[in-house]
Amino acid sequence: MTEEIKNSNWRLRNGQIIAAKQMTASEKWFDIKLDDGDLDHEPGQFVQVELYGIGEAPISVCSSPTKRGSFELTVRAAGRLTRHMHSLDVGDWVGIRGPFGKPFPVKLMTGSDLLFVAGGLGIAPLRSLINFVIDNRRDFGTVNILLG
């Protein structure tokens, strides 16, 4: 495998579910460990989750990049793949591509007061940024979260 392919975000990586919890009737949380290292994402990015024989779907990473060893996803059962994900549990494997997407401009936020506004599952992609801010609390001003 060439170095370029090895380091490509499009390369399919194996991820094992190391924890899972049904949050609501339609949302399930997963903690996933890649078999070849950390995800190395930034707040606001997403991954493509592949279930072998089912397909792929984009899902926002909801853990902070400061969390090492695994990453978290919250999945709403809305389509074929995401409904099937709700049947998965600890020990099951999924395919992961990514991270993808333009991250939040964290460096521009440094020293500023922050207001997070979200509704429903919209808090999941913000959770990555919120946890990053908590983990780097001294770098930010007042933090407020409005959840509807």
Predicted regions and their residues:
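Ferredoxin-reductase
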Residues: 2-92, 148
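FNR/FR-type flavoprotein reductase catalytic core
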Residues: 3, 80-148
